[in-house]
């Protein structure tokens, strides 16, 4: 359900930002939007530290990718609900008008600057790993620098894909980048447990060539293809091997190459 109300008066919180909307997608997934600090400048794909105070008044902070693009007036986040998670056990209950802590110091490797120029850009994500790509899919630079953008998103069930599906659908009608996206963005969602028209792990669909066949495109080529990866540790490791088998090399902000991996969230109890 969507909630939207006028912004409430600020409480005394360090780096406080006010929640402007909350949506629960499944019993384990939710997204929310907050006010944006006037001083915050970030590149689409980066993350910030957000949090809440615990019972003793101490901040519980975790890294969260900004799911909204750099041009958005608000900030959006997409989160899993962990019942016993130090932060998400509290964060999942936030309501419009309440506040969170947001440290306005964005960082991250999933930025276009960390890739060499190319023709095709792949976003490879599992679960809430789609968050940085929710930002990048709405980033005009992605479509100005690449001829094609391919979003591969794998979840266990169809319901868990809904956040990404609705985002891609809305992009087509977006007044700012709808025309840029047209004909360039390809969306390839898959499930790993529930029956769906596309099934299987991203690594398997890439390694077998099934995704290329389904989309009617050429296989990966280090001369033309660039990729960004965000998921669990096991996913990151496995997909890196597949990308390397196609001749792509891992890069970084300081040394742009053919693909980059976000490792900030791996193994983090949330």
From Swiss-Prot:
Keywords: Cytoplasm, FAD, Flavoprotein, NADP, Nucleotide-binding, Oxidoreductase. Residues 12-113 form the FAD-binding FR-type domain. The keyword Disulfide bond does not apply. NADP(+) binds at residues 126, 156, 192-193, 201, 238. It comes from the Bacteria. Coiled coil: none annotated. It catalyses: 2 reduced [2Fe-2S]-[ferredoxin] + NADP(+) + H(+) = 2 oxidized [2Fe-2S]-[ferredoxin] + NADPH; reduced [flavodoxin] + NADP(+) = oxidized [flavodoxin] + NADPH + 2 H(+). Its EC number is 1.18.1.2, 1.19.1.1. GO terms for molecular function: ferredoxin-NADP+ reductase activity; nucleotide binding. InterPro entries: Cbr1-like_FAD-bd_dom, FAD-bd_FR_type, Flavoprot_Pyr_Nucl_cyt_Rdtase, FNR_bac, FNR_nucleotide-bd, FNR_type-1, OxRdtase_FAD/NAD-bd, Riboflavin_synthase-like_b-brl. PROSITE patterns: FAD_FR. It is found in: Cytoplasm. Its main location: cytoplasm. GO terms for biological process: cellular response to oxidative stress; heme catabolic process. Its cofactor is FAD. One of its GO terms (cellular component) is cytoplasm. FAD binds at residues 62-65, 78-80, 86-88, 128, 264-270. Induction: Induced under oxidative stress conditions. Belongs to the ferredoxin--NADP reductase type 1 family. Transports electrons between flavodoxin or ferredoxin and NADPH. Monomer. This is Flavodoxin/ferredoxin--NADP reductase.
